Amino acid sequence: MKPNLRELSQLAGTDIADEAEQEAAALRLVEDGACEALVVSLGASGALLATAAGIERFTAPSVSVRSRTGAGDSMVAAITVSLARGNSLRDSVLFGIAAGSAATMTPGTELCRLSDTDRLFERVRLKSIVTA
């Protein structure tokens, strides 16, 4: 599942004010069996991955934003392709963040470019890990 922050708040049935509440809401959805892995897109702040093992936070590379249209779709598609290629969930999320960031660099409804995604992939960072 890949909600954005607003969608996570709706799924959790509560307002989410800070990182601790983001993590608690995401873990609760995993623990309640809604999904095995939850990737929450946080826009320019990156993303978080929640699994039964805990939370991993990732930073997104800084880019010049031309349009946000399609960023979430690009992120989901890149995660899916990466997993289908046999990459780890963590590496797939990193690739997804790169693709979502790359999509914001394109005008209008144009989706991400692979060359931009590959270049940005090297700039996505694992920020923190919190074990459950």
Name each region found by the language model:
Residues 1-24, 46:
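Conserved beta-alpha-beta core of the PfkB/ribokinase-like small-molecule kinase fold
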Residues 19-132:
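Conserved phosphate-binding/catalytic region of the ribokinase-like
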